[in-house]
From Swiss-Prot:
This is Soluble pyridine nucleotide transhydrogenase. InterPro entries: Class-I_Pyr_Nuc-Dis_Oxidored, FAD/NAD-bd_sf, FAD/NAD-binding_dom, FAD/NAD-linked_Rdtase_dimer_sf, Pyr_nuc-diS_OxRdtase, Pyr_nucl-diS_OxRdtase_dimer, STH_gammaproteobact. It catalyses: NAD(+) + NADPH = NADH + NADP(+). It comes from the Bacteria. Belongs to the class-I pyridine nucleotide-disulfide oxidoreductase family. Binds 1 FAD per subunit. PANTHER family: DISULFIDE OXIDOREDUCTASE (PTHR22912), SOLUBLE PYRIDINE NUCLEOTIDE TRANSHYDROGENASE (PTHR22912:SF93). GO terms for cellular component: cytosol. Its EC number is 1.6.1.1.
Length: 466
């Protein structure tokens, strides 16, 4: 007789990956429970990561826009807002997102269980509940979607009230005048924009030789220049020797011999998977040094009945991709295989001020591959819509094959870049000759719009051909 389990599948984590898996499973008729360690669903994305940081960024960018607009600004007086004020805006967005996502589970009759899960054996979980009790749950299959957390080196005193990571920064209760940010990845650069936009002095410590080296170099250089122009001090190729927490701030000793002091430190250098409490050794699974699990194309781990999605499997570590991974894993879990798969060119959105977004190859990659490409550019300052709304800083760059006209990569720097990129992405995904830069010349755009940048860039690129 077949074994009887409490559930067909248990999903550990309610972030984008867990939500995608849970919704995919219940839509296929599976009996599903979702385990969430916190009181509210949504995971790190909703409560400490994507949603609050982007809400902060939006509030700050609107303040900057107001202060720079000659129609509204009185140059003898600037509009200012406290960190607490803009955190309130983020809290409102978080609450809306939480209620909406809670509704998804309720409407689909998906059970939510609060507590910390750990494996007892291959088909059994122990759930440590908030009241101290322990429940035993069984399932035929599992999806691990427990996300990640900021990496904490053992020699950094994170309990110190002036030393923050990208989670605890959202609980800041003082108004800093000077911030040190260690780590110039996506999170570090986004918070550098936020704090500098609030007129806070920022020292950005980069352990590498340029910002966001995975980007097209022109985009990286544009961000570096914009930071320099706004007053952010960037220190490349630096590593800390020692970090001292003081009563009035933080002192950072760098291996190069420099010493820096500021009101507080945001440590934003790396993340680690939330797998250490799952007792994975009880089911024969091991993680790498970052707490991440290896999976196959269907998101199965080394144990075929255990799947993993989202940050816990590493690249690309994007909320958008995690949801799709969960949906694909759900299909594979129920049907034995998945017909869906992640798209080849996943767009990247970086919410600095201004935004950066890209999809496809960079100039550096195409040059190394010896692909005969050409470049088409549109400067935002030449677009009527950008002039109307005062968003003159920015550019759209299209890389395309000189002979076939196929679009190979699109890169955008400027306000609304993460939205603008999807127009080009839609054309890049077309098959059978549909992916061509000539589409943008032969179609009619609304006028005036930021989308018109595609027509301008396409004409600019095609005019370079001979």
């Amino acid at each position: 007789m077949p074994h009887s389990y409490d559930y067909d599948a248990i999903v550990i984590g309610s972030g984008p990956g867990g939500e995608g898996a849970a919704m995919g499973l219940v839509k296929q008729g599976a009996r599903v429970a979702v385990i969430e360690r916190y009181q509210n669903v949504g995971g790190g994305c909703t409560h400490w990561g994507t949603i609050p940081s982007k809400a902060l960024r939006h509030a700050v960018s609107r303040i900057i826009e107001f202060n720079q607009n000659p129609l509204y600004s009185d140059h003898s007086r600037l509009l200012r807002s406290s960190f607490a004020d803009i955190l309130n805006h983020a809290d409102n967005v978080i609450n809306q997102q939480t209620r909406m996502r809670q509704g998804f589970y309720e409407r689909n009759h998906c059970e939510i269980l609060q507590g910390n899960a750990r494996f007892v054996d291959e088909h059994t979980l122990a759930l440590d509940c908030p009241d101290g009790s322990v429940e035993t749950l069984t399932a035929e299959k599992f999806v691990i979607a427990c996300g990640s957390r900021p990496y904490h080196p053992t020699d950094v005193d994170f309990p110190h009230p002036r030393i923050y990571d990208s989670d605890s920064i959202l609980s800041m209760h003082h108004e800093p005048r000077h911030v040190l940010i260690y780590g110039a990845g996506v999170i570090g650069c986004e918070y550098a924009s936020i704090f500098r936009g609030m007129d806070v002095k920022v020292d950005l410590i980069n352990t590498r030789d340029r910002l966001l080296a995975f980007l097209d170099q022109e985009m990286s250089d544009s961000l570096s220049y914009h930071f320099w122009n706004s007053g952010v001090v960037i220190r490349h190729n630096e590593e800390y020797e020692k970090i001292e927490g003081c009563d009035d701030g933080v002192i950072m000793h760098l291996k190069s011999g420099k010493k820096l002091k500021a009101d507080c430190l945001l440590y934003a250098n790396g993340r680690t998977g939330n797998t250490d409490s799952l007792a994975l050794q009880n089911i024969g699974l091991e993680t790498d040094s970052r707490g991440q699990l290896k999976v196959n194309s269907m998101y199965q781990t080394a144990q075929p009945h255990v799947y993993a999605v989202g940050d816990v499997i590493g690249y690309p570590s994007l909320a958008s991709a995690a949801y799709d991974q969960g949906r694909i894993a759900a299909q594979a879990l129920v049907k034995g295989e998945a017909t869906a798969h992640l798209i080849e060119d996943i767009p990247t959105g970086i919410y600095t001020i201004p935004e950066i977004s890209s999809v496809g190859k960079t100039e550096q990659q195409l040059t190394a591959m010896k692909v005969p490409y050409e470049v088409g550019r549109a400067q935002f300052k030449h677009l009527a819509r950008a002039q109307i709304v005062g968003m003159n800083v920015g550019t759209l760059k299209i890389l395309f094959h000189r002979e076939t006209k196929e679009i190979l990569g699109i890169h955008c720097f400027g306000e609304r870049a993460a939205e603008i990129i999807h127009i080009g992405q839609a054309i890049m995904e077309q098959k059978g000759g549909g992916n061509t830069i000539e589409y943008f010349v032969n179609t009619t755009f609304n006028y005036p719009t930021m989308a018109e940048a595609y027509r301008v860039a396409a004409l600019n690129g095609l005019n370079r051909l001979f």
